[in-house]
Curated annotation (Swiss-Prot):
This is Proteasome subunit beta. The gene is prcB. Coiled coil: none annotated. Residues 1-50 form a propeptide. It comes from Jonesia denitrificans (strain ATCC 14870 / DSM 20603 / BCRC 15368 / CIP 55.134 / JCM 11481 / NBRC 15587 / NCTC 10816 / Prevot 55134). InterPro entries: Ntn_hydrolases_N, Proteasome_sua/b, Proteasome_suB-type, PSB_actinobac.
Length: 302
């Protein structure tokens, strides 16, 4: 780069414009997504994939959460990956899909928002942020078609409407504002079922956090690529709150307490049964023949 500008800066650094992405595309294109060599097909286990993320509204903002597992094919690649990030002071992004590319996208998105605010002297509107993320996703389309998708959730506090808002995306960059709740990733079909049953209008923050955890528990129960809370290693899902005060993570202590409470409740709700042959009960009891078994819930046993 030739240095010909005033004060010894290269001309590119003095070019007008508030978009860091446009600047990088012109002066350092190799750092941009989608500039690396491509292939006709890419094995599914070539890179770690993040799995399940959820977000939901509560009466004063948004709760956004993600499990901690990344997989490579049938292998657990990481047990403590982070999938929920602050985009700026009043918005958040959660990622599912190809982990390395998604984390790179998050960093570029954070830098893009920061660069815009420094140049313009004011932050982008929430709709502007959501649209900018959509544009960035569209540049990844060819990689998504080769098996390396990125599917984020974006959420933030809208200072104009004085409310939290949720945005879901597809791999083409399509942007969809979602009322109430949304989810993405391999366990999203199970998480969505839990959210449908549990979400109610005007939730408080504590209940909304519990519902997000319940949705991830249900997803982990049926999807091998989604991790539930790891009680032995004390690894919990990551959850963040976005409201008029800004972005903040839920503390480890609060997550541990909430997960322990859910585990206790579910263990109490689980009904164990025993199969007994009439007249014979004990360690030596053999399996009964068809038609002779009696199912006795433990709660009914004396």
């Amino acid at each position: 780069m030739t240095i010909t500008g005033s004060r010894g800066f290269p001309d590119g650094y003095l070019a007008p414009g508030s978009s860091f992405l446009d600047f990088a595309a012109q002066h350092a294109p190799t750092i941009m997504p989608g500039t690396q060599p491509t292939f006709d097909t890419i094995p599914q286990d070539i890179a770690p994939h993040g799995t399940t993320i959820v977000a939901l509204e509560y009466h004063n903002g948004i709760i956004i959460a993600g499990d901690r597992r990344a997989t490579m094919g049938t292998t657990i690649a990481h047990r403590e990956i982070e999938k929920v990030f602050a985009a700026d002071e009043h918005s958040a992004i959660a990622i599912a899909g190809t982990a390395g590319l998604a984390i790179e996208l998050v960093r570029l998105f954070q830098l893009e928002l920061e660069h815009y605010e420094k140049i313009e002297g004011t932050p982008l509107s929430l709709d502007g942020k959501a649209n900018r993320l959509s544009t960035m996703l569209r540049s990844h389309l060819h990689l998504a078609l080769q098996g390396l998708p990125i599917v984020p959730i974006f959420a933030g506090w809208d200072s104009t409407r004085h409310q939290g808002r949720l945005f879901a995306y597809d791999v083409t960059g399509g942007r969809y504002e979602e009322p109430n709740f949304t989810c993405a990733g391999s366990g999203s079909v199970f998480a969505r079922s839990a959210l449908k049953k549990l979400w109610k209008p005007q939730l408080d923050a504590t209940r909304a956090i519990t519902i997000a955890l319940e949705a991830l528990w249900d997803a982990a129960d049926d999807d091998t690529a989604t991790a539930g809370p790891d009680i032995i290693r004390r690894i919990w899902p990551i959850i963040a709150v976005i409201d008029h005060k800004g972005f903040r993570y839920v503390s480890e202590a609060d997550l541990a307490h909430a997960n322990d409470t859910i585990a206790h409740q579910r263990s109490q709700d689980h009904q164990h049964v025993r199969v007994l042959e009439p007249g014979r009960d004990g360690p030596g009891n053999r399996l009964p023949s068809q038609g002779s078994a009696t199912i006795i819930p433990e709660s009914d046993q004396s």
